């Protein structure tokens, strides 16, 4: 009985020490139609901690997700999925990451992942994006700045 108690205590301690290393998992759906319109990511803004994973799910086919060049932290890792394929991205470097769907960027299918402190927020310049995507990124950046 005493050995069982010691083993249980060891397992519990190990779980506490190891679980932060794995981080939490978040889900972003790639949709033709959702709560905020057509051709969207849901949610379009995800706030996470360093070490967390975002699972981009191609719920509706014909979408992909990629980080937008020049709109991620300087030491952040770019990411990209093939068309109609899911993608898991573990984020380590803090900051703001802009992501988009190549075929649907012109209609505003873009979003943000904010990892911890959004230190690079003032370096994000969406002016090179199509008008709808630019407008959406500006609105999402305003939400991050306002803490909403």
Each language-model region and where it sits:
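Bacterial N-terminal signal peptides
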Residues: 7-17
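Extracytoplasmic copper-binding redox domains, predominantly the cupredoxin/blue-copper superfamily
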Residues: 21-148
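Positively charged n-region of N-terminal signal peptides that target proteins for export
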Residues: 1-4
